[in-house]
Amino acid sequence: MIQQETRLKVADNSGARSLLCIRVLGGSKRRSAGIGDVIVASVKEATPGGAVKKGDVVRAVVVRTKKETRREDGSYIRFGENAGVLINSDGSPRGTRIFGPVARELREKGYTRIISLAPEVL
């Protein structure tokens, strides 16, 4: 459950370290984002020499949430942190590596490139 003002870690090597959610995309009344949803965020911390700088406004897809997500079989999955991956306007990841596990719900949402780069899919 990511909403406005939520801080997220960045799970790729795009140069950003942490994000602040500005907006959840997908309708004017949409308040929260889950795994696989796209948000607009501001870069709050960045590594020197990275592709993005502090203060840049970027789009990101949520790959891990602390709030549990219910699956079709009745099981739940949750992670220890909120994390996102920066994406371009066409939905492809901006970084070349993904760090940490990602949820398999991303495959159903069409983010196969993120799935293939991730070291572990839960």
UniProtKB/Swiss-Prot annotation:
Q: Which GO terms describe its molecular function?
A: large ribosomal subunit rRNA binding; structural constituent of ribosome
Q: How does it assemble?
A: Part of the 50S ribosomal subunit. Forms a cluster with proteins L3 and L19. In the 70S ribosome, L14 and L19 interact and together make contacts with the 16S rRNA in bridges B5 and B8.
Report what the protein is called: Large ribosomal subunit protein uL14
Q: Which residues form a coiled coil?
A: none
**One biological-process term from Gene Ontology?**
translation
A Pfam family of the record is: Ribosomal_L14
Could you give one GO CC term from the UniProt record?
A: cytosolic large ribosomal subunit
Q: Which HAMAP family match?
A: Ribosomal_uL14 (MF_01367)
Its function?
Answer: Binds to 23S rRNA. Forms part of two intersubunit bridges in the 70S ribosome.
The protein's UniProt keywords, in alphabetical order, are: Ribonucleoprotein, Ribosomal protein, RNA-binding, rRNA-binding
Name the protein family.
Answer: Belongs to the universal ribosomal protein uL14 family.
Organism name: Rubrobacter xylanophilus (strain DSM 9941 / JCM 11954 / NBRC 16129 / PRD-1)
